[in-house]
Amino acid sequence: MGAILPLQWLYEQLNITMSEDVKHLFESIMGSSWGYLALGILAPVAEELVFRGAILRSLMAYFNYRLPWIPIVVSALLFGAVHGNMAQFANAFVMGLLLGWLYCRTHSIVLGVALHWVNNTVAYTMYKLMPEMNDGQLIDLFHGDNKLMY
């Protein structure tokens, strides 16, 4: 949440939005009975196995573990790019930096999977509990009241 809200504000200022195709994809996944399984459980495990367990670990070995920030940034950029749209890129990139740093500190994906799960679960829960936020506008978090927002 600490990165999501400021980035969402920046997206609104720059008028960066998700494409309609991506919005429809999310709505169909979130609306299905297996949506949480896919986004809340399977995605964190699969993405951590690929991006930290395989890509970051390989890059770390290539750089002989001497320059950890280069592999962390490269894997985070790939993680952001794989999310497929500018509206998710920055959030995924920042999350990828954090998860990469955690992997470098622990040499395990377990903590990364847990943090990734929490992140996706919070997003899923907000989507389900606050349908007015489904358009991604911060004003909806404050029930349309500009005074509460600023």
Where are these predicted regions, by residue range?
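Juxtamembrane helix-loop-helix connectors linking adjacent transmembrane helices
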Residues: 1-46, 56-64, 136-142
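Membrane-embedded alpha-helical segments of multi-pass membrane proteins
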Residues: 33, 37, 90-98, 118, ...
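Hydrophobic alpha-helical transmembrane segments
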Residues: 33, 37, 69-74, 89-90, ...
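Hydrophobic residues within alpha-helical transmembrane segments
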Residues: 42, 74-78, 90, 94, ...
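Membrane-interface helix/loop boundary segments of multi-pass membrane proteins
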Residues: 46-74, 101-108
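Active-site-flanking alpha-helical
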Residues: 50-59, 90, 114, 123
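Membrane-interface helix caps and helix-loop-helix hairpins in membrane proteins
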Residues: 81-87
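C-terminal membrane module of polytopic membrane proteins
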Residues: 117-150
